[in-house]
């Protein structure tokens, strides 16, 4: 016994047990209990583990319990040192605990009180030592600070969601403080117990229907409490021997039929309701401000009363609080909501998987990559910033991550929760249907004038077709839904406070209200949930807001539209669209999918991520007892499926590839199920197909591989009757009889060798798309191509004359390839055309859009509008005479004439053209003055004798994209353009390389002559002043360092450099802003320049400009000090708080005011400059490099050099480091530049010029923080393209000029 006692004592000492210290009054009230130890003590309450010496709880004998002693009055001092008495009503927590009966909540035993304190008694869990502990303690014991098994995470998530669903929907209780300190792990099976309801809120009392009943209950409760107080006072005056039942008399008897979840194990855990040594309210206590301003408002017995706790924003734990509460900088009873509990659940799960709930500039916590997509998606749904779109418990219970678990049955026995609602990926929750208003437009504007303030959702019915203006909407409207027939929506009239937009309108035509395709900033930046079910057009960059998380597009995306998905913002986590299955297998890649997406649906079917073309749909893990990781899908060969399995219950791979007919007849998937959507015949397949050989009726797509040998005659009935897509291989060249192509085929594609005559009726009337191979050259009689065809593409050898009726009247896209050179007029070209394309052999004089005029006789009057729908015209052929007015239809908006190099007469280009491509040898540059103002994109080519004539006055005023010789030109044009000389490959004499290095080297060198010619560009001495405003969009997704666009001010070029989380460790958590002189960075002769200015940086408050932040300074900018600014401009939390007004629509604005303080200093005449070649180094597979590496040796200034790169930084791990290293003897004084090329936006390349004297001892110089790794890897920045970066090095040799002196 002595040994055991000593061991127990040692164990308790090792656990840092707090010695019980209670007041005499508390000890007197708790005379029936032996206080074993105090678990937690703060200024508001004391929680302790106790042993009951006698008596029972609710007629049930227990040995141990948890007692929470809550002070009714607490003394504090305000900022003026005035004493404040804070009153607390502990009965509010009691009233909540009395209502709860759930397996995942510590059982409530009772309540008592005296004049100073309230006492709450709850269950103490008994189990094995070191088993019962909080999630916080468990994480601290794990070396990886996370639970490795995702099954544990799933089990914990399921328990907590079931509990919250019960609390929110059945009991109408909000917990308000869900975190790792308040969740207890009760056993080795990870059964959870939630406790500490001190911040909880009972929202049932706010129900309009129950107000009267609640008031009565309140009065009764108050009377009972007063009686209890009187009893306590009387009993305290009696002797202890005569008061054995005093405590029991004051306990609220509830849950008489409940059974404790504790077991009968003899050993007890040093934990229980208090969560071991962890503080029950430790999370709240650490995030509350320690200043005297933190107060609780005086509670009362009224259930309408509220509390207020100020939040310490400097504590990292504040991120555990829901953002809608954290932004108010205080926790209030009114601020708590069901969705704030969901945020706490997401943070708890994130900590369990090793994540960090801290929010950086991307607005949301980062979720570890090792998790399954289902798990990541579940956590993402819990951690959505906007509470309107954060999933509630009903939606979470339908999530795939927890939809099936072994814990479900045991929980259902204890939880009579309400039925859950089945939902899909595109579901968003609106808490009350009373918040929805249906608008039919019958009363006109009167309907909008009468919208109540509690309405949050407007749904427009089919009869509504009024114009929408911004003034119609009140600030409470956050959800809008428009019907399919609505066609008068101007996106610019939508308010900025919307979070959900569902628009069923059409985008196939351009209207007076919106363009055919979405443009940047069409959709309000505040939109989080966006549904465009009829949008089947290209996605432009920045057309989808950066905060959008849920996106639904159209059901008929094409190849170009699929490839444009790469322009979607990385914020999207759920994406859904539809397209032909063939496009998924041939064009969709993982790189096109937003990086944070965890749920992808195509054609209403879930796509498994990361996306693999070989298995886009995969198999689920409910086949046998396979050990699939984390509930993810896996692939099993179809022929290996056991017949005993219920295959129809599986999600089967939609595509099956067949090598021979025996496999076709024996394949279990084809013979037992109707789940196959696409059948592919391999290259080796070349057997006749017989009637009924393909039994599955679910097949809608049949394809013979491109190199397939199949060349067998098709008989009627050999192909599946429900086929909608048919694609032949290259070898197929058999005559087709009527009926051999199934009647439902809509997509028909022939291979290279097919060149058979087609009879009337061979192609079914259902067909909408036909593409012929390169060898097809048969005449087509009228009606052979059915009227249903909308897209017709011919191969390169097709060159047959066309007559009226050859092409259907409803065709929209017609493409002729290279050999076609036939005459076309309005009699042969359908009037329905939207897209028309000709090959290189076509003569433009043979195409007459206007029958009344020709290219030889100019038309003086506009022709009748015959081709009103033609918007795209691509003509790769040649011209013999210049274009005349009305040669082209006036409806064209996209025009490509890559062989046109002649004069542009006035009005020869239609006035609606927005995109124009001209020839590669254009010489008559002055005729650009005749181009229409509508042009936004212009591309052409010219030689060096012409390019110098181009100036901004010749460019259309609305043009924002200009390409010359394939290179992007920055607009506006402010200086004479120059042609870069052709790249020069290094010779054997200029590089000292091994033979292997020479084979691998593909670097190119550039000529610096252009920079040499512009050396005097910076020598202006203009002493004016000016200002510039910079808008930084998508700020929350910016990481590390980034730059503003270049701007001109006081005779120089500048840009601002930002550090999103501080420049260094001392400024972490701050926004750093510096101004950089780009002339000093980009020009090789800036070593001789010094520019002194005074400047002021202003972070504009976009809601209240008077509260903008300004900081002023002065600086002399030189090659050694080309940056200057502030490392701690503003704290990130203040910046990101939307209530402060600095970040609006995810955009910040910075104003720069500058004035020179002295003229420009130039010391150019002190040096001789040796002009030399630059070295370009292309680095492939950059994302896979982690160790330092060097470039091949290159020669410059007669010396040997290399570039040394540290992909993960030297010494900083968040930046790529780049150094120039001297590999020769002697000493060399040089002026050199290091440049990282932006391959998408060359004008935004990063380039630094610097002077350094190299020798054998100091042989290396460069930049440890050349560029942030996250910025480098960001595909939108353009530095990393095809996993390749390009580094350029330019070196100038500097030699001082020796002046000679003479005597007279």
Swiss-Prot record:
Species classification:
Eukaryota, Amoebozoa, Evosea, Eumycetozoa, Dictyostelia
Which terms does the record give in the GO molecular function aspect? ATP binding; protein kinase activity
Pfam families, per database record: FNIP, MATH_2, Pkinase
Q: What transmembrane ranges does the database entry give? A: none
The Swiss-Prot or TrEMBL record describes its family as follows: Belongs to the protein kinase superfamily. STE Ser/Thr protein kinase family.
Comp. bias (Low complexity): 210-269
Domain notes, please?
A: The protein kinase domain is predicted to be catalytically inactive.
Where's the MATH domain?
A: 1025-1154, 1172-1291
Question: Can you say what this protein is called?
Answer: Probable inactive serine/threonine-protein kinase fnkC
Q: Where is this region: Disordered?
A: 208-277
Query: Which residues form the FNIP repeats?
Result: 514-556, 710-753, 754-797, 798-841, 900-943
- Name the positions where ATP binds: 39-47, 68
Protein keywords: ATP-binding, Nucleotide-binding, Repeat
Question: Which intervals hold domain Protein kinase?
Answer: 33-402
């Amino acid at each position: 016994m002595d040994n055991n006692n000593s061991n127990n004592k040692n164990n308790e000492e090792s656990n840092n047990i707090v010695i019980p210290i209670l007041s005499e009054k508390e000890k007197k009230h708790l005379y029936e209990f032996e206080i074993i130890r105090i678990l937690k003590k703060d200024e508001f309450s004391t929680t302790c583990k106790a042993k009951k010496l006698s008596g029972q709880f609710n007629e049930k004998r227990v040995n141990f319990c948890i007692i929470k002693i809550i002070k009714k009055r607490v003394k504090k001092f305000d900022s003026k040192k005035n004493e404040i008495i804070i009153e607390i009503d502990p009965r509010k927590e009691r009233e909540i605990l009395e209502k709860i009966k759930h397996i995942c909540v510590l059982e409530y035993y009772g309540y008592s009180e005296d004049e100073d304190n309230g006492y709450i008694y709850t269950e103490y869990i008994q189990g094995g030592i070191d088993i019962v502990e909080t999630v916080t303690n468990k994480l601290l014991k794990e070396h990886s600070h996370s639970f490795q098994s995702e099954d544990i995470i799933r089990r914990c998530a399921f328990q907590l969601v079931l509990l919250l669903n019960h609390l929110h929907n059945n009991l109408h209780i909000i917990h308000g403080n869900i975190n790792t300190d308040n969740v207890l792990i009760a056993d080795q099976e990870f059964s959870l117990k939630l406790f500490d309801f001190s911040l909880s809120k009972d929202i049932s009392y706010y129900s309009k229907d129950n107000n009267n009943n609640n008031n009565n209950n309140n009065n009764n409760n108050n009377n009972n409490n007063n009686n209890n107080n009187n009893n306590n006072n009387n009993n305290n005056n009696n002797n202890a021997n005569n008061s054995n039942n005093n405590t029991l008399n004051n306990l609220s008897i509830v849950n008489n039929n409940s059974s404790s979840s504790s077991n009968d194990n003899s050993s007890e855990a040093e934990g229980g309701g208090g969560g071991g040594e962890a503080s029950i309210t430790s999370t709240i206590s650490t995030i509350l401000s320690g200043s005297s301003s933190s107060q609780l408002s005086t509670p009362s017995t009224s259930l309408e009363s509220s509390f207020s706790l100020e939040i310490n924003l400097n504590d990292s734990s504040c991120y555990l609080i829901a953002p809608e509460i954290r932004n108010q900088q205080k926790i209030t009873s009114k601020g708590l909501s069901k969705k704030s509990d969901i945020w706490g659940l997401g943070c708890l799960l994130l900590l369990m998987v090793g994540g960090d709930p801290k929010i950086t500039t991307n607005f949301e916590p980062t979720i570890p990559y090792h998790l399954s997509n289902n798990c990541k998606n579940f956590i993402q749904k819990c951690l959505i910033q906007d509470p309107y779109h954060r999933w509630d418990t009903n939606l979470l219970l339908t999530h795939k991550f927890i939809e099936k678990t072994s814990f479900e049955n045991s929980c259902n026995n204890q939880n009579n929760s309400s039925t859950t609602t089945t939902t899909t990926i595109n579901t968003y929750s609106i808490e009350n249907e009373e918040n929805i208003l249906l608008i039919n437009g019958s009363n006109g504007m009167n309907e909008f004038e009468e919208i109540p303030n509690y309405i949050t959702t407007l749904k427009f019915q089919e009869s509504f077709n009024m114009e929408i203006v911004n003034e119609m909407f009140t600030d409470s409207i956050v959800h809008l839904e428009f019907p399919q027939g609505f066609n008068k929506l101007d996106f610019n009239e939508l308010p900025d406070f919307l979070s959900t937009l569902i628009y069923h309108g059409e985008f196939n035509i351009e209207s007076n209200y919106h363009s055919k395709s979405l443009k940047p900033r069409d959709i309000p930046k505040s939109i989080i949930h966006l549904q465009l079910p009829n949008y089947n057009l290209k996605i432009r960059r920045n057309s989808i807001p950066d905060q959008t998380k849920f996106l639904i597009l159209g059901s008929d995306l094409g190849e170009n539209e699929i490839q444009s998905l790469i322009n979607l913002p990385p914020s999207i986590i759920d994406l859904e669209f539809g397209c032909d299955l063939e496009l998924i297998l041939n064009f969709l890649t993982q790189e096109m999918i937003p990086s944070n997406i965890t749920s992808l649906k195509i054609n209403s079917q879930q796509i498994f991520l990361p996306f693999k073309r070989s298995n886009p749909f995969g198999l689920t893990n409910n086949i046998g007892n396979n050990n699939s990781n984390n509930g993810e899908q896996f692939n099993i060969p179809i022929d290996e499926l056991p017949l005993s399995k219920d295959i129809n219950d599986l999600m089967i791979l939609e595509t099956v590839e067949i090598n021979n007919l025996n496999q076709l007849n024996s394949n279990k998937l084809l013979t037992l199920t109707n789940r196959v959507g696409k059948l592919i015949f391999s290259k080796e397949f070349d057997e006749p197909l017989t009637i009924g050989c393909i039994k599955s009726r679910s097949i809608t797509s049949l394809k013979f591989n491109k190199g397939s040998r199949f060349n067998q005659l098709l008989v009627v009935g050999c192909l599946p009757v429900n086929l909608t897509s048919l694609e032949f291989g290259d070898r197929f060249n058999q005559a087709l009889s009527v009926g051999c192509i199934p009647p439902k085929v809509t997509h028909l594609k022939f291979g290279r060798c097919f060149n058979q005559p087609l009879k009337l009726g061979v192609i079914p009337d259902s067909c909408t798309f036909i593409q012929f191979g390169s060898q097809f050259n048969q005449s087509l009689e009228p009606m052979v191509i059915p009227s249903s065809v909308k897209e017709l593409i011919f191969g390169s050898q097709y060159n047959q004359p066309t007559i009226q009726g050859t092409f259907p009247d409803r065709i929209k896209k017609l493409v002729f390839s290279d050999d076609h050179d036939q005459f076309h007029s309005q009699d042969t070209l359908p009037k329905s055309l939207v897209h028309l394309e000709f090959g290189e052999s076509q003569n433009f004089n043979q195409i007459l859009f206007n029958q009344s005029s020709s290219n030889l006789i100019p038309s003086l009057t506009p022709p009748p509008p015959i081709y009103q729908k033609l918007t795209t015209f691509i003509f790769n052929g040649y011209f013999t005479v210049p274009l005349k007015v009305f040669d082209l239809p006036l409806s064209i908006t996209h025009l490509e004439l890559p062989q046109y190099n002649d004069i542009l007469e006035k009005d020869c280009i239609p006035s609606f053209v927005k995109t124009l491509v001209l020839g590669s040898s254009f010489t008559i540059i002055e005729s650009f003055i005749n181009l229409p103002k509508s042009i936004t994109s212009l591309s052409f080519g010219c030689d060096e004798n012409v390019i110098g004539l181009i100036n901004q006055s010749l460019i259309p005023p609305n043009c924002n994209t200009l390409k010359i010789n394939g290179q992007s030109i920055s607009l506006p044009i402010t200086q004479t353009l120059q042609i870069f000389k052709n790249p020069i490959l290094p010779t054997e004499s200029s590089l000292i390389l091994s033979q292997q290095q020479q084979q691998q080297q593909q670097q190119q060198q550039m000529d610096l002559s252009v920079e040499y010619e512009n050396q005097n560009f910076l020598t202006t001495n203009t002493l004016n002043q000016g200002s510039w405003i910079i808008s930084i969009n998508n700020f929350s997704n910016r990481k590390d360092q980034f730059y503003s666009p270049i701007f001109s001010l006081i005779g120089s070029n500048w840009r601002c450099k930002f550090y999103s989380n501080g420049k260094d460790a001392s400024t972490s958590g701050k926004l750093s802003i510096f101004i950089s002189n780009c002339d000093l960075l980009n020009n090789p002769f800036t070593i001789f320049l010094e520019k002194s200015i005074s400047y002021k940086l202003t972070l504009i408050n976009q809601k209240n400009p008077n509260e903008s932040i300004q900081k002023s300074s002065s600086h002399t900018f030189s090659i050694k000090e080309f940056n200057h600014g502030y490392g701690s401009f503003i704290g990130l939390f203040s910046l990101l708080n939307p209530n402060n007004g600095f970040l609006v629509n995810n955009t910040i604005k910075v104003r720069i005011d500058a004035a020179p303080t002295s003229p420009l200093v130039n010391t150019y005449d002190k040096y001789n400059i040796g002009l030399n070649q630059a070295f370009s180094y292309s680095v492939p597979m950059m994302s896979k490099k982690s160790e330092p590496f060097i470039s091949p040796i290159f020669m410059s200034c007669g010396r040997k050099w290399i570039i040394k790169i540290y992909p993960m930084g030297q010494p900083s791990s968040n930046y790529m480091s780049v150094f120039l290293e001297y590999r020769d003897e002697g000493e060399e004084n040089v002026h050199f530049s290091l440049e990282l090329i932006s391959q998408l936006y060359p004008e935004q390349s990063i380039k630094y010029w610097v002077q350094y004297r190299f020798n054998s001892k100091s042989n290396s110089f460069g930049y440890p923080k050349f560029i942030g790794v996250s910025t480098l890897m960001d595909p939108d920045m353009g530095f990393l393209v095809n996993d390749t970066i390009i580094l350029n090095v330019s070196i100038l040799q500097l030699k001082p000029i020796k002046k000679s002196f003479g005597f007279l």
